[in-house]
């Protein structure tokens, strides 16, 4: 076997890791990248969708680039928890910095304000990336493989329930009736997010760090880069996983950051609709986790990736369909005016919230399943190197919207998501022996029966 499926379970770490994830998900809801942040950037810049794409790209690339340079560094360290603590302090400081810049900036769009905010979002994401390998290494060494799906699923389930409450709070804070106008409303959102993230980081900072198998010598960066393509050539599962992630990045970058701008600009929805979308996403996310974690633990992460990828095809497709629906009035929804077109469009946030945890759990655990422990940092680091250029796809999406409006971007997102689905059906399940699965070619998703939820 390539990984130890019988790693002992450290119950203290398991519990603290769940608390960490639950509070982190709640914190993230107050600055959710596909709902809150696009609306914030539109308000900050006066409506420029290219700036929405740039901020989305900076956040994503901030998550990727440190992994490229830190893979070899972490592979020689027996103590990883201090790096997680430092990175968490940086993240909280960056969010507080954003709140301060927005609070004390002059009224109206200003280039320096946008650059400062965008730079701090990049710092926030980069600090998170610094803690990524320590976090996953500690988690992986604290529990057996067949408990990871339940672990991440429980984090997402309970965190999703708190995120529903966060969505209600976001709607109230952004509502005109609340009395807070821009930028004070977003200053409050970012301040709440910073406080909750500090609590989340504090929980994981007191875990008991397990023993790690480390490399005796740090490989030079060129050697890490050379090792990555070799892993990609030799490991079919790794290669297919990276293709699916690439298609998924194109799908997400073409539509994800621009769903809320579409609602605000084309459907003429009020700002408070962001909170309603967030509630829908959080409810779908929380509801999905019982299913995703059970599939991952009992049927394997390959099956999890297939079903979550199938669900991920729907958001952009629904948004595309909504363009053909008439804007007939239907009454109110969450206290907001509702039209038939907005109602159909809002359905896109159900599969968006439903698919995201499955993709996160499946991709993370599948990569941990196929990566031998001593090469784990090389697998993780090179995977981010491959994905780094595609982090800037939201800028391409913004340019497409600027010339052909939203329809072409949503169509491209649907096609790319379908390509990601076809790719994951070709994966082999690395835990097939433990799960009692036959090594057979995967049937098409449409020919499988839907797994029972747990």
Where are these regions (language model features)?
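Helix-loop boundary and gating motifs at the non-cytosolic
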Residues: 1-65, 74, 84, 91, ...
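Helix-to-loop junctions at the C-terminal end of transmembrane segments
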Residues: 66-79, 174, 288-301, 401
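Intracellular juxtamembrane helix-capping segments at the cytosolic ends
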Residues: 128-143, 259, 357-371
């Amino acid at each position: 076997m390539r990984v130890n499926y019988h790693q002992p379970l450290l119950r203290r770490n398991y519990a603290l890791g769940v608390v960490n994830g639950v509070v982190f998900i709640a914190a993230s809801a107050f600055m959710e990248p596909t709902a809150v942040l696009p609306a914030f950037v539109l308000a900050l810049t006066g409506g420029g969708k290219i700036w929405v794409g740039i901020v989305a790209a900076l956040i994503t690339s901030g998550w990727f680039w440190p992994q490229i340079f830190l893979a070899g560094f972490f592979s020689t360290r027996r103590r990883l928890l201090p790096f997680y603590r430092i990175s968490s302090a940086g993240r909280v400081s960056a969010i507080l910095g954003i709140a301060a810049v927005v609070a004390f900036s002059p009224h109206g769009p200003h280039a320096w304000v946008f650059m400062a905010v965008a730079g701090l979002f990049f710092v926030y994401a980069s600090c998170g990336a610094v803690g990524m390998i320590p976090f996953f290494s500690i988690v992986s060494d604290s529990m057996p493989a067949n408990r990871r799906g339940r672990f991440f699923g429980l984090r997402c389930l309970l965190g999703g329930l708190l995120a529903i409450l966060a969505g209600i709070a976001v709607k109230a804070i952004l509502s005109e009736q609340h009395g807070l106008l821009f930028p004070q409303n977003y200053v409050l959102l970012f301040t709440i997010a910073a406080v909750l993230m500090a609590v989340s980081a504090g929980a994981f900072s007191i875990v008991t760090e397990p023993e790690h198998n480390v490399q005796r010598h740090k490989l030079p960066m060129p050697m890490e880069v050379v090792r990555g393509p070799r892993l990609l050539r030799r490991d079919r599962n790794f290669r297919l996983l990276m293709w699916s992630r690439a298609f998924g990045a194109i799908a997400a970058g073409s539509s994800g950051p621009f769903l809320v701008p579409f609602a605000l600009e084309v459907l003429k929805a009020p700002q408070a609709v962001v909170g309603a979308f967030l509630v829908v996403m959080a409810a779908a996310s929380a509801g999905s986790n019982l299913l995703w974690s059970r599939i991952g633990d009992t049927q394997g992460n390959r099956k999890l990736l297939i079903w979550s990828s199938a669900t991920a095809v729907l958001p952009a497709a629904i948004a595309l369909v909504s363009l053909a629906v008439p804007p007939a009035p239907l009454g109110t929804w969450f206290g907001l005016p509702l039209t038939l077109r907005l109602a159909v469009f809002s359905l896109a946030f159900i599969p968006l919230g439903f698919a995201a945890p499955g993709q996160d759990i499946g991709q993370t655990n599948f990569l941990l399943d196929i990566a031998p422990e001593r090469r784990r940092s090389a697998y993780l680091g090179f995977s981010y190197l491959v994905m780094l250029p595609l982090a800037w796809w939201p800028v391409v999406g913004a340019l497409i919207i600027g010339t052909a409006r939203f329809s072409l971007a949503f169509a491209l997102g649907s096609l790319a998501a379908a390509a990601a689905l076809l790719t994951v059906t070709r994966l082999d399940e690395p835990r097939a022996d433990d799960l009692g699965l036959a090594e057979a070619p995967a049937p098409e998703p449409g020919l499988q029966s839907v797994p029972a939820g747990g």
